[in-house]
Curated annotation (Swiss-Prot):
It holds the Pfam family Ribosomal_S28e. Keywords: Acetylation, Cytoplasm, Ribonucleoprotein, Ribosomal protein. Transmembrane segments: none annotated. GO terms for biological process: cytoplasmic translation; maturation of SSU-rRNA; positive regulation of nuclear-transcribed mRNA catabolic process, deadenylation-dependent decay; ribosomal small subunit assembly; ribosomal subunit export from nucleus. It comes from Saccharomyces cerevisiae (strain ATCC 204508 / S288c). This is Small ribosomal subunit protein eS28B. It comes from the Eukaryota. It is found in: Cytoplasm. SUPFAM superfamilies: Nucleic acid-binding proteins. Present with 8600 molecules/cell in log phase SD medium. There are 2 genes for eS28 in yeast. Gene3D superfamilies: Nucleic acid-binding proteins. Component of the small ribosomal subunit (SSU). Mature yeast ribosomes consist of a small (40S) and a large (60S) subunit. The 40S small subunit contains 1 molecule of ribosomal RNA (18S rRNA) and 33 different proteins (encoded by 57 genes). The large 60S subunit contains 3 rRNA molecules (25S, 5.8S and 5S rRNA) and 46 different proteins (encoded by 81 genes).
């Protein structure tokens, strides 16, 4: 990770479910730490739980909802 790359910190407020062909991805709703009124849905690979802090390299992309 380059030190000049802008990153955004986001807090996991709700775990929505597992997705991916083998369930290896978790869909979560995150709240930005700088702007707490803004929330988006993201896909996260690896272990994650509520109140975890994520470092988002790209903060505009939102995941499609689970069916």
């Amino acid at each position: 990770m380059d030190s000049k790359t802008p990153v955004t910190l986001a807090k996991v407020i709700k775990v929505l479910g597992r997705t991916g062909s083998r369930g290896g991805v978790t869909q979560v709703r995150v709240e930005f730490l700088e702007d707490t009124s803004r929330t988006i849905v993201r896909n996260v690979k690896g272990p994650v739980r509520e109140n975890d802090i994520l470092v988002l390299m790209e903060s505009e992309r939102e995941a499609r909802r689970l069916r």
